[in-house]
Amino acid sequence: MVKAVCVLKGTTGEVTGTVYFEQESDSAPVKLTGQIIGLAPGLHGFHVHAFGDNTNXXXXXXXXXXXXXXTHAGPTDKDRHVGDLGNVAKIDITDKMLTLNGPLSIIGRTMVIHEKADDLGKGGNDESLKTGNAGGRMA
């Protein structure tokens, strides 16, 4: 079993949270649990970004971790970015595309909470296919 933890902190300190990850084996889905506090009411996009460096207010986090040139989508869609995890405040997700092992592991990458709801790639424009129109980064 592989376990990991991500501590989220917003740029102003108001948004904070902790996400816990568990994967029973290389082929098992990843279980995510946790909670984010300090968010405005409503849904907020939640993504794994490609790089782990968030020292420049998350600007260096780049786009969501993607595989095989897929576009942005929802967590239950077959063709999606690996890091597309939908909308959160309280986290209880089991995901078959994430892994904590091997070259596609999300360990060492940045988790980002966005200011708006994620439209899951169904917003009908180019930005929707890249980011889900989830807006700025809160943490």
From Swiss-Prot:
Region Disordered, annotated ranges: 118-139
Binding site for Cu cation: 47, 49, 114
Bias (Basic and acidic residues) ranges: 118-129
InterPro entries to which the protein is assigned, alphabetical: SOD-like_Cu/Zn_dom_sf, SOD_Cu/Zn_/chaperone, SOD_Cu/Zn_BS, SOD_Cu_Zn_dom
Enzyme class: oxidoreductase
SUPFAM superfamilies: Cu,Zn superoxide dismutase-like (SSF49329)
UniProt catalytic activity: 2 superoxide + 2 H(+) = H2O2 + O2
Residues reported to bind Zn(2+): 72, 81, 84
GO-annotated molecular function: copper ion binding; superoxide dismutase activity
Record carries keyword Transport: no
Lipidation (S-palmitoyl cysteine): 6
Cofactor: how bound: Binds 1 copper ion per subunit. Binds 1 zinc ion per subunit.
GO cellular component term of the entry, any: nucleus
Pfam families, sorted: Sod_Cu
Transmembrane segments: none
Signal peptide: none
Subunit field text: Homodimer.
Stated role: Destroys radicals which are normally produced within the cells and which are toxic to biological systems.
Sequence similarity: Belongs to the Cu-Zn superoxide dismutase family.
Protein name: Superoxide dismutase [Cu-Zn]
Protein source organism: Lampanyctus crocodilus (Jewel lanternfish)
Gene: sod1
